[in-house]
From Swiss-Prot:
It comes from Neisseria meningitidis serogroup B (strain ATCC BAA-335 / MC58). This is Protein-export protein SecB. The keyword Cytoplasm applies. Its main location: cytoplasm. One of its GO terms (biological process) is protein folding. It is found in: Cytoplasm. Homotetramer, a dimer of dimers. One homotetramer interacts with 1 SecA dimer. GO terms for cellular component: cytoplasm.
Amino acid sequence: MSEELQPVFSIERLYVKDLSLEVPHAPQIFLEQGEPEVEMRVSTGSQKLEDGYYNVDVTVTVTAKLDNERTMFLNEVTQSGIFRLENIPEEDADLLLGVACPNILFPYAREAVSGTVTRAGFPPVLLAPINFEAIYQQQQEAEAAGA
């Protein structure tokens, strides 16, 4: 009787690949009044490292501006993880790398943004959860339309 190989999905390591904060108008910006406009951009990516091991990145860029022109701060974090995937069909692996892994990484990126911004002297930035499944579906549809 042949032994069926069990699927493996595990987190091997979580780490901050890149973290930067710019406060271009300090210290004057701290004296200005007004409610900042906060813009967030998120991107994801993955790469195969070796058999069964993948690196996944979630990059979050947060920009806060006063009066839609003066930048209060620009914060960027790339939260990464090394994941082990074995005995998983390719289409399922793509879904894990595009949805499950970013869902695991995003709370760490969110905490890094909030902590960095707070340590810079600003009120914390609370980022809303991201629907990585919807983003993945949009990417799949765009690739299918382009093929």
